[in-house]
Protein backbone atom coordinates (compact mmCIF):
# COMPACT_ATOMS: atom_id res chain seq x y z
CA UNK A 1 0.00 0.00 0.00
CA UNK A 2 1.05 3.59 -0.54
CA UNK A 3 0.14 6.85 1.16
CA UNK A 4 -0.13 9.91 -1.09
CA UNK A 5 0.31 13.32 0.56
CA UNK A 6 1.41 15.42 -2.39
CA UNK A 7 -0.33 18.57 -3.69
CA UNK A 8 -3.94 17.80 -4.67
CA UNK A 9 -3.34 18.35 -8.39
CA UNK A 10 -0.95 15.36 -8.39
CA UNK A 11 -3.21 12.92 -6.50
CA UNK A 12 -5.06 11.41 -9.47
CA UNK A 13 -1.97 10.79 -11.60
CA UNK A 14 0.02 9.32 -8.71
CA UNK A 15 -2.83 7.21 -7.32
CA UNK A 16 -3.83 5.78 -10.71
CA UNK A 17 -0.21 4.86 -11.45
CA UNK A 18 0.12 3.08 -8.11
CA UNK A 19 -3.20 1.25 -8.50
CA UNK A 20 -2.19 0.11 -12.01
CA UNK A 21 0.76 -1.55 -10.27
CA UNK A 22 -1.53 -3.35 -7.83
CA UNK A 23 -1.01 -1.05 -4.85
CA UNK A 24 -3.78 -0.09 -2.43
CA UNK A 25 -3.85 3.70 -2.00
CA UNK A 26 -4.54 5.89 1.03
CA UNK A 27 -4.75 9.38 -0.46
CA UNK A 28 -4.69 12.57 1.56
CA UNK A 29 -7.68 14.91 1.30
CA UNK A 30 -8.89 16.37 -0.94
CA UNK A 31 -8.94 13.14 -2.91
CA UNK A 32 -8.95 14.80 -6.33
CA UNK A 33 -9.06 18.20 -8.02
CA UNK A 34 -12.44 17.55 -9.62
CA UNK A 35 -15.15 14.95 -10.26
CA UNK A 36 -13.57 13.62 -13.46
CA UNK A 37 -10.30 12.87 -11.66
CA UNK A 38 -12.12 11.21 -8.76
CA UNK A 39 -14.14 9.02 -11.14
CA UNK A 40 -10.94 7.99 -12.96
CA UNK A 41 -9.39 7.08 -9.61
CA UNK A 42 -12.42 4.98 -8.60
CA UNK A 43 -12.36 3.20 -11.99
CA UNK A 44 -8.65 2.44 -11.58
CA UNK A 45 -9.29 0.97 -8.13
CA UNK A 46 -12.10 -1.21 -9.47
CA UNK A 47 -10.21 -2.25 -12.61
CA UNK A 48 -7.16 -3.26 -10.59
CA UNK A 49 -9.05 -4.81 -7.64
CA UNK A 50 -7.38 -2.53 -5.09
CA UNK A 51 -8.63 -0.24 -2.34
CA UNK A 52 -8.65 3.54 -2.75
CA UNK A 53 -9.36 5.47 0.44
CA UNK A 54 -9.32 9.16 1.26
CA UNK A 55 -7.44 10.06 4.44
CA UNK A 56 -10.33 12.00 6.01
CA UNK A 57 -9.37 11.23 9.61
CA UNK A 58 -12.07 13.18 11.52
CA UNK A 59 -14.93 11.00 10.21
CA UNK A 60 -13.20 7.98 11.76
CA UNK A 61 -12.80 9.66 15.14
CA UNK A 62 -14.72 8.01 18.02
CA UNK A 63 -16.25 11.41 18.88
CA UNK A 64 -17.70 11.72 15.39
CA UNK A 65 -19.27 8.26 15.66
CA UNK A 66 -20.76 9.23 19.04
CA UNK A 67 -22.26 12.43 17.63
CA UNK A 68 -23.70 10.57 14.64
CA UNK A 69 -25.18 7.87 16.89
CA UNK A 70 -26.86 10.36 19.25
CA UNK A 71 -27.83 13.19 16.89
CA UNK A 72 -31.51 12.22 16.74
CA UNK A 73 -31.75 12.42 20.55
CA UNK A 74 -31.32 16.19 20.29
CA UNK A 75 -34.65 16.58 18.53
CA UNK A 76 -35.21 18.72 15.48
CA UNK A 77 -32.08 20.63 14.53
CA UNK A 78 -32.78 23.86 12.68
CA UNK A 79 -29.37 25.56 12.74
CA UNK A 80 -26.01 23.93 12.05
CA UNK A 81 -22.66 25.72 12.23
CA UNK A 82 -19.29 24.26 11.26
CA UNK A 83 -15.97 26.09 11.22
CA UNK A 84 -12.42 25.18 10.33
CA UNK A 85 -10.20 28.25 10.31
CA UNK A 86 -6.48 28.37 10.91
CA UNK A 87 -3.99 31.05 10.07
CA UNK A 88 -1.51 29.27 7.83
CA UNK A 89 2.13 29.97 8.55
CA UNK A 90 2.56 29.74 4.77
CA UNK A 91 0.27 32.77 4.37
CA UNK A 92 3.02 35.06 5.70
CA UNK A 93 5.34 33.73 2.99
CA UNK A 94 2.52 34.15 0.43
CA UNK A 95 2.17 37.82 1.37
CA UNK A 96 5.92 38.20 0.73
CA UNK A 97 5.56 36.67 -2.76
CA UNK A 98 6.28 32.97 -2.15
CA UNK A 99 3.55 30.79 -3.65
CA UNK A 100 3.34 27.37 -1.99
CA UNK A 101 1.03 24.61 -3.23
CA UNK A 102 -1.75 25.44 -0.75
CA UNK A 103 -2.15 28.86 -2.38
CA UNK A 104 -1.44 27.79 -6.00
CA UNK A 105 -4.35 27.35 -8.39
CA UNK A 106 -2.40 24.92 -10.61
CA UNK A 107 -1.91 22.67 -7.57
CA UNK A 108 -5.65 22.75 -6.75
CA UNK A 109 -4.89 24.80 -3.67
CA UNK A 110 -7.14 27.05 -1.65
CA UNK A 111 -8.86 27.02 1.70
CA UNK A 112 -11.88 24.95 0.63
CA UNK A 113 -9.72 22.14 -0.74
CA UNK A 114 -7.38 22.23 2.27
CA UNK A 115 -9.57 22.81 5.34
CA UNK A 116 -13.12 23.53 4.15
CA UNK A 117 -13.46 19.89 3.14
CA UNK A 118 -13.62 18.97 6.83
CA UNK A 119 -16.78 21.06 7.23
CA UNK A 120 -18.36 19.73 4.04
CA UNK A 121 -17.58 16.09 4.84
CA UNK A 122 -18.92 16.42 8.39
CA UNK A 123 -22.10 18.17 7.28
CA UNK A 124 -22.95 15.59 4.61
CA UNK A 125 -21.93 12.69 6.85
CA UNK A 126 -24.16 13.85 9.69
CA UNK A 127 -27.11 15.44 7.86
CA UNK A 128 -27.02 14.13 4.28
CA UNK A 129 -26.97 16.09 1.04
CA UNK A 130 -28.52 19.55 1.29
CA UNK A 131 -31.25 20.78 -1.04
CA UNK A 132 -29.41 23.96 -1.98
CA UNK A 133 -25.93 25.40 -1.58
CA UNK A 134 -24.71 28.97 -1.91
CA UNK A 135 -21.22 30.22 -1.24
CA UNK A 136 -18.89 33.17 -1.15
CA UNK A 137 -15.12 33.43 -0.87
CA UNK A 138 -12.25 35.80 -0.33
CA UNK A 139 -10.08 35.39 -3.44
CA UNK A 140 -6.32 35.68 -3.29
CA UNK A 141 -4.12 37.05 -6.09
CA UNK A 142 -3.48 33.50 -7.37
CA UNK A 143 -7.20 32.89 -7.91
CA UNK A 144 -7.68 30.47 -5.02
CA UNK A 145 -9.84 31.13 -1.99
CA UNK A 146 -8.15 32.28 1.19
CA UNK A 147 -11.40 31.91 3.13
CA UNK A 148 -15.04 31.29 2.43
CA UNK A 149 -18.55 30.62 3.61
CA UNK A 150 -21.00 27.98 2.44
CA UNK A 151 -24.70 28.09 3.27
CA UNK A 152 -26.55 24.82 2.82
CA UNK A 153 -30.30 24.45 3.23
CA UNK A 154 -32.33 21.43 4.28
CA UNK A 155 -36.09 21.13 4.80
CA UNK A 156 -36.61 23.24 7.92
CA UNK A 157 -32.90 23.72 8.61
CA UNK A 158 -29.94 25.81 7.52
CA UNK A 159 -26.23 25.10 7.83
CA UNK A 160 -23.39 27.61 7.76
CA UNK A 161 -19.82 26.57 7.16
CA UNK A 162 -16.89 28.96 7.53
CA UNK A 163 -13.35 28.02 6.58
CA UNK A 164 -10.11 29.94 6.26
CA UNK A 165 -6.35 29.71 5.84
CA UNK A 166 -5.88 33.47 6.34
CA UNK A 167 -7.70 34.23 9.61
Label every PLM stretch briefly:
Residues 5-6, 84, 163:
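Glycine-rich, N-terminal phosphate-binding loop of Rossmann-like dinucleotide-binding domains
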Residues 40-57, 76-79:
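Rossmann-fold dehydrogenase core element
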Residues 26, 51-53, 81, 134, ...:
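Structural detector of well-ordered beta-strand residues that form the stable sheet scaffold
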Residues 21-23, 48-51, 157-158:
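A short helix->loop->beta-strand "cap" motif at the edges of active sites that frequently abuts
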Residues 119-167:
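Contiguous beta-strand/loop segments that form the cofactor/metal-binding neighborhood of enzyme cores
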Residues 1-44:
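Beta-loop-alpha module in the N-terminal Rossmann-like domain of NAD(P)-dependent dehydrogenases
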Residues 58-131:
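Predominantly a Rossmann-like dinucleotide-binding segment in NAD(P)-dependent oxidoreductases
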Amino acid sequence: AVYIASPIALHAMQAIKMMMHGKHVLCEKSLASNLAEAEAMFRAAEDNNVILMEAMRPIHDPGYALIKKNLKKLGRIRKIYLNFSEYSRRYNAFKEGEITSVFAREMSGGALMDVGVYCVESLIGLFGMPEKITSAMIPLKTGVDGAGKIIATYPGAIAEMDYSKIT
